[in-house]
């Protein structure tokens, strides 16, 4: 006998609330995706190929990297492995959210919002769970993930079909577009930041700084993740040890 489908708890956030809460992400995604569409066509990809990247890969800054590598003649495997190394942090997003979610999850809905779990969507979901985890719902998550994905695809369509070189005379604007995603991600993280996490954040920053100074950006990402996670584990064990005595 099949288990009953989990129902949203009374007072939980709705799909439309998720769409509404995605507005800051949508506003930042459209211009960056627009720049990606322009850049991809400038590198020789067709408008349809550019849109395909955004629909299927949906990897933000990694899309700029993979299109540049493919245009330069790199093999598909090398480009794919490079992007996987850059985005390895996404492996931790699901477990991190799951540890805070108190509701039962429905596999079909989870698969939908998991596809759209970008840095910014993850940060927004974390902030929601930190403020009030009882209001979090999969319908809300689908709303924010779907709206964000749609805005990314929409921005790519506009950029890819508007013609190459539209921002060529405005380098400052093009540089600012590339900074919008990191700035948005940091704003969400600061909104959910708690003082007790200071040590973990410091360790992650030190690890990332050492990685980027001594090696490369992918190594810096891995080093930051490892240092932050190890510090969190040590801190949790140290704080929990007295209770076991």
Swiss-Prot record:
Record field: transmembrane: 25-45, 64-84, 110-130, 141-161, 173-193, 206-226
Record-linked InterPro entries: Brnchd-chn_aa_trnsp_permease (IPR011606)
GO cellular component: plasma membrane; transmembrane transporter complex
Record's subcellular location: Cell inner membrane
Periplasmic side: 46-63, 131-140, 194-205
GO biological process: L-valine transmembrane transport
Topology class, membrane: Multi-pass membrane protein
Membrane topology (Cytoplasmic): 1-24, 85-109, 162-172, 227-245
Pfam assignment, any one: AzlC
Record family assignment: Belongs to the AzlC family.
Protein name: Inner membrane protein YgaZ
The organism of origin for this protein: Escherichia coli (strain K12)
Gene name of the record: ygaZ
């Amino acid at each position: 006998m099949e288990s009953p489908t989990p129902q949203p708890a009374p007072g939980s956030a709705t799909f439309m609330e998720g769409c509404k809460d995605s507005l800051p992400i949508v506003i930042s995604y459209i211009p960056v995706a627009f720049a990606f569409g322009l850049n991809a066509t400038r590198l020789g990809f067709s408008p349809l190929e550019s849109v395909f990247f955004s629909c299927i890969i949906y990897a933000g800054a990694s899309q700029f990297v993979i299109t540049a590598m493919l245009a330069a003649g790199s093999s598909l495997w090398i480009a794919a492995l490079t992007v996987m190394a850059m985005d390895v942090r996404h492996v931790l997003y699901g477990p991190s959210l799951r540890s805070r979610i108190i509701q039962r999850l429905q596999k079909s809905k989870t698969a939908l919002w998991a596809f759209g779990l970008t840095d910014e969507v993850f940060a927004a979901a974390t902030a929601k769970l930190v403020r009030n985890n009882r209001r979090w719902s999969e319908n809300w998550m689908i709303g924010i993930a779907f709206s964000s994905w749609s805005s990314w695809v929409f921005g790519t369509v506009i950029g890819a079909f508007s013609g190459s070189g539209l921002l060529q005379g405005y380098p400052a604007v093009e540089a600012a577009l590339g900074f919008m995603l990191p700035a948005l991600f940091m704003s969400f993280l600061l909104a959910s930041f708690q003082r007790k996490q200071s040590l973990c954040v410091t360790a992650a920053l030190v690890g990332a700084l050492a990685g980027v100074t001594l090696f490369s950006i992918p190594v810096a990402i891995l080093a930051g993740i490892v240092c932050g996670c190890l510090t969190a584990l040590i801190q949790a064990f140290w704080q929990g040890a007295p209770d076991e005595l």
